[in-house]
Structure formats: C-alpha cells, structure tokens
Amino acid sequence: MNNEYELINNLDESISELPTDSIVSKTIYKSENQKVILFGFSSGQELSDHTSSSNAVIHIIKGECEIIVGSDTISASSGTWVHMKPELPHSVSALSEMHMLLYLYP
C-alpha cells in the first residue's frame, strides 16, 4: 500500500450482495475537504428530495435510474455524471439495481 494514493480495483466488489428493498452506502474516501461515498440501490429504491450543503457530483457506475435535479428529470445509466451546486434540491430513484458514486466537496 502506498501512502500517496488509494486504489480500489473493483468498485462493484466494495458493495456486498444487496438485500431486497434496500440502499447500502460505504464511504470509500474521506479527507479534510472531500468525501466519496459508494451507494448500492435495489431496484425501486430511492433517495427522496433533499439538498447538500456542499458541491456534489453523482456518477452512475452500474444500472439505470432517474435523477431529479431542481425541476429537471434526467434518465441516467452507467457513465452518467451530474454536478450540483450546494442547496440544489435533488432525488435519485433506481429503475434497476444501481451503483453510484457521490463526491462531496466545498
């Protein structure tokens, strides 16, 4: 292990088997100025409308979902990347089993 960087070879392996009707999350990186959280959603699960006090980036790495950002609805799938400024209302609804990274920073 090198103290100058952190490596995860396979993000999917970082999320164990998803129980039915659940959302799991795991903080995979945290520093003074940044936090990265890996989420796993069972199909049909959602994070209801909320805001963040930080800048936030949602990066979908597996599956399909609907992201509502402000008044816009986005059909998202693997590879979708969304940046949001602080205090912008947003929600995420999984249309299939879905994994996403959430980056939070000032």
PLM region spans:
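A cytosolic small-molecule/anion-sensing beta-strand core signal
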Residues: E32, I61-K62, S77-S78, S96
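Short acidic-glycine-tyrosine-enriched beta hairpin
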Residues: S71-P86
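Ligand-binding loop in jelly-roll beta-barrel domains
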Residues: P86-P106
